[in-house]
Design a protein with these regions (language model features):
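Juxta-kinase regulatory segment immediately upstream of eukaryotic protein kinase catalytic domains
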Residues: 2-37
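ATP-binding pocket architecture of kinase catalytic cores
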Residues: 42-209, 213-219
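All-alpha amphipathic helical-bundle segments outside canonical DNA-binding/catalytic cores
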Residues: 177, 294-306
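Conserved protein kinase catalytic-loop anchor
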Residues: 220-222, 240
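Catalytic-loop of the protein kinase fold
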Residues: 222-224, 229
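Activation of the activation-loop gatekeeper triad in protein kinase-fold domains
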Residues: 243-248
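Active-site activation/catalytic loop segments of kinase-like enzymes and analogous catalytic loops
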Residues: 255-292, 306-325
């Protein structure tokens, strides 16, 4: 996992000096890994991760299975967050499940809820190389020849994620699909807008359309719920990791497909409907060949509309973190404008009579 420094400081334990924090972290790593001793060489913030904090953790392990210098990531909770996010222990568990299912993810290593180590819950994973910068991936001409193949591989990766099915004892903390399916999500959007001080009539209209077009139930699968460009790493043209699992849970398989294809995640390449990198065909082909399941365009269309509403609500929540909760982060402040972009997309996708161009 790569990135550049941000203005945040090292994770803090109140009343404990930075050097002592590194010592405490080193002791945890030694105990968790079975090493004789560990020296924390570097702990540097990484850009990206709008919901959580990521730190490049370089450490030297003396003895044990990890002997030598290791390049890791420490992932912990941001000062403020989004209510739908899993906690770090839960995210660690879903990352382990994805890793075991053969999904290309950073290998999860160790987790802790002990606030005495870095001040809040965290987990560690191997650091993978490359970039997740969406605008770079979608706009770099050097990548263009490889992007259809990357889209096809991403379709296969998504199908592997969807091989995880309920019930799972290791994922027992996930809410049942009946409590997180489209009906529940739509009700949550409406409740949020009812509390919001600013009227959003286009979102209300989109919500009403969703309420009257919910597709028939389907067998739930494990869904990433934020599978998109910007949440995977590329090292050149090589996919090195699917990232940011904090929203994952049980869902309709078409939900992840609709989210990936939503216009809000094309990053100025609106002509490339699959994540801003390719046409839908290679992405769908990869998914269908790996899963043995056909993609249903009508279901995808419903989930694209829901994705636009959901992204708009998340954008408003991110702005709340800046305006109300006081988290001074420019990215959070700027995210609010995305809500208006989502509203425009809803207007373009749904015709004035309340029907759908894709339904």
């Amino acid at each position: 996992m790569a990135g550049t420094g941000s203005p945040q400081s090292e994770p803090r334990v109140p009343g404990v000096a930075a050097e002592d924090r590194r010592t405490t972290l080193a002791r945890f790593l030694a105990a968790a890994s079975g090493a004789h001793a560990v020296e924390v060489i570097g702990l540097t913030p990484l850009r990206g991760g709008a919901i959580q904090e990521n730190w490049a953790l370089d450490a030297y392990f003396s003895g044990g299975a990890f002997s030598g210098e290791q390049r890791l990531v420490l992932r912990t909770t941001a000062p403020t967050g989004v209510a739908a996010s899993l906690d770090r222990r839960e995210e660690f568990a879903v990352l382990k499940a994805a890793f075991a299912a053969g999904v290309t993810v950073p290998e999860p290593l160790w987790a802790s809820d002990d606030p005495e180590i870095v001040g809040k819950p965290f987990f560690t994973m191997r650091r993978v190389e490359g970039t997740a910068a969406a605008h770079r991936i979608t706009r770099d001409p050097a990548l263009d020849p490889a992007l259809p193949a990357i889209a096809e591989q991403l379709g296969r990766e998504l199908a592997r994620i969807h091989t995880i099915r309920p019930p799972r004892a290791d994922l027992a903390f996930l809410a049942p699909y009946e409590e997180v399916g489209p009906t529940h999500q739509i009700a949550g959007f409406r409740a949020y807008l009812d509390r919001h001080p600013t009227p959003r009539p286009v979102l209300e209209w989109g919500i009403r359309w969703l309420e009257t077009h919910i597709p028939p139930p389907t067998e739930p699968v494990f869904s990433h719920h934020d599978f998109r460009t910007g949440n995977y790493m590329l090292d050149g043209t090589v996919l090195t990791g699917i990232l940011d699992w904090e929203f994952s849970g049980w869902g309709d398989p078409h939900e992840d497909i609709g989210w990936f294809c939503c216009k809000g995640w094309r990053f100025a390449r609106l002509d490339r409907e699959a994540g801003g990198i390719a046409d839908r065909a290679p992405f769908y082909r990869g998914y269908e060949s790996e899963s043995g399941r056909s993609v249903e365009p009508r279901r995808v269309f419903f989930w694209e509309i829901l994705a636009s509403v959901r992204w708009a609500v998340i954008a408003l929540q991110q702005t709340d973190r800046y305006m109300i909760a006081g988290e001074r982060n420019l990215d959070l402040a700027l995210t609010g404008r995305r809500a208006t972009e989502c509203e425009l997309e809803i207007l373009m996708l749904l015709d004035p009579g309340g029907g759908a161009s894709g339904a």
